[in-house]
Amino acid sequence: MGKVLGIDLGTTNSAMAVYTNGEAAIIANKEGKNTTPSIVAFTDKGEVLVGESAKRQAVTNPEKTIYSIKRIMGLMCEEEKANEAKERLPYHIIDRNGACAIEVAGKTYTPQEISAKVLMKMKEDAEAYLGETVTDAVITVPAYFNDAQRKATKEAGTIAGLNVLRIINEPTSAALAYGLDKKEAEQIVVYDLGGGTFDVTALETGDGVVEVLATGGDAFLGGDDFDNRIIDYVADEFKSESGIDIKADVMALQRVKDAAEAAKKELSSATETEINLPFITADASGPKHLVTKITRAKFESLIGDLVAKTIKTIEAVLKDAGLSKNDVKEVVMVGGSTRVPLVQEEVKKFFNKELNKSVNPDEVVALGAAIQGGVLAGDVKDVLLLDVTPLSLGIETLGGVMTKVIEKGTTIPAKKSQIFSTAEDNQPAVSIHVLQGEREFAKDNKSLGMFELRDIPAAPRGVPQIEVTFDIDANGILTVSAVDKGTGKSQEIKITGSSGLSDEEIEKMVQDAEAHKAEDEKRKAVVEAKNQADALIHQTKKSLDDLGENFDANEKAGIEAAIADLETVLKDDNATKEQIDEKVKALTEKSHKLAEAAYAKEQGGQQGAADAGKKADDDDVIDAEVE
């Protein structure tokens, strides 16, 4: 195997490194820079510019200059974040089969294609630097990226001519680069605030092992959002002075964006900066110039709520990991936006300890990816990465309940199976609805996909055994399969169509799950009671039909009346578990003699109605049915 390229494919900038001569080293691009802007531009002459050259011409070509494409990777157009992206980004975002894509000069490009152009440049620059062909790569992604986003990232690599050996999480990669796996076992937190995404991950490291304990973050929080706060402030000030809305002029807005980014960087070392943009626009009275001063205090007031949001995420991650602030031995700062003084101050204040800033925050993730490349190439020994799935995975079962197959926080790769059955007699097919989240009901969780297992042989409900298997590979990409154990017929789906969960959504799901826990459990108890009652009615009616005239007419009438009472309660959407249980008890008592009569029959074999709805003896069979 040749050299493996470690790539940090960032929202704002990307970096690359390689493991050679016993250490990871950053590879400079052809321009001599250690980072490459993740920007692609299309010129009127049909040229495609990537990196610095694309960034330089953005002011004169804003609608054909594509930046922050990572923000719409795997995003569905119906999502709220898609509307935010459309409002903020100057290029044309369109709907392509439900997913976000972009349109430039009448041509449609997917986020994968745009990202691939950045990766192609990096591959070419690496080959020029190393003097050899590079085909293998390890690419990093935010820890909360879902299956579709991870697969899209891998596809971008493939389009760029790379063989993507592994997709790994950015904070895990950073921990490797800091050499934290070489120390004694300890708990660390990686705080990763980049240009467009934010990640907090709690890890346990030591003795060559890096294990993720919990992760959180936001796909729409980063340096871009800090820039946007400055842009909004400057635009509002200019409008109040001149009456002109410069946001309506894409070329003027691009100039303000560039100035805002520069001001943000200057305020990391200076206490005041000036934005000076002559001839920004014009009206009937002549040209207008934009000149305004911004102090660090003003900047911090503009972004204070965003920084506070990151602290809340730290609290949630520590809670999920079962750690206190005092348990954390190292706080590692990653990402260019961690240079902002307010960010450092608030994180330091929260943990009450000095922060680890010993490695360049723009380069650390790429260095870690190169080390993982060395592991895969066999050049690095005794290093093991253990990542986790950020949310539970499961399927929808009878009554709209989500039945979990893989629990949140499970170390990946992971493979787990459960046995389900049919909900109706002679049911010819089952629909497998794959879900992600922490709520009790399917509708409250994220839908990842759906498929059907067909041609199930005719059989009574509960008889067919459908084995559903969830398989998450080391890249975090999920495959779900279903097998009819009676016939061997199978079907599977690789989850690729979902839009991706931002960690904001993940955090909201967890919070919602906690807030609605009592309510959800109450609703779930009603659904389970209804399912059990329905099974009891089904079995009782079947026993009555089997016995026919051999059963006492008065007893039969009493049972039928009890069935009718129970069916009436089941039709009531507002029925409580207690009301259902009361009618179930009445029918069960009435059915005792029916059970005795059934067992007394010579052919036997009929199960008593009182046992209906109980769990099968097979420990692998769970008490849930697939609609």
Swiss-Prot record:
The lineage of its organism: Bacteria, Pseudomonadati, Campylobacterota, Epsilonproteobacteria, Campylobacterales. This is Chaperone protein DnaK. SUPFAM superfamilies: Actin-like ATPase domain, Heat shock protein 70kD (HSP70), C-terminal subdomain, Heat shock protein 70kD (HSP70), peptide-binding domain. It comes from Sulfurovum sp. (strain NBC37-1). PROSITE patterns: HSP70_1, HSP70_3. Keywords: ATP-binding, Chaperone, Nucleotide-binding, Phosphoprotein, Stress response. GO terms for molecular function: ATP binding; ATP-dependent protein folding chaperone; unfolded protein binding. Acts as a chaperone. Belongs to the heat shock protein 70 family. Residues 598-627 are annotated as: Disordered. Gene3D superfamilies: 1.20.1270.10, 3.30.420.40, Actin, Chain A, domain 4, Substrate Binding Domain Of DNAk, Chain A, domain 1. The keyword Zinc-finger does not apply. It holds the Pfam family HSP70. Residues 618-627 have a biased composition (Acidic residues). The gene is dnaK. InterPro entries: ATPase_NBD, Chaperone_DnaK, Heat_shock_70_CS, HSP70_C_sf, HSP70_peptide-bd_sf, Hsp_70_fam. Induction: By stress conditions e.g. heat shock. Residues 598-611 have a biased composition (Low complexity). NCBIfam families: PRK00290.1 (NF001413), PRK05183.1 (NF003520), prok_dnaK (TIGR02350). It comes from the Bacteria. The modification Phosphothreonine is found at residue 197.
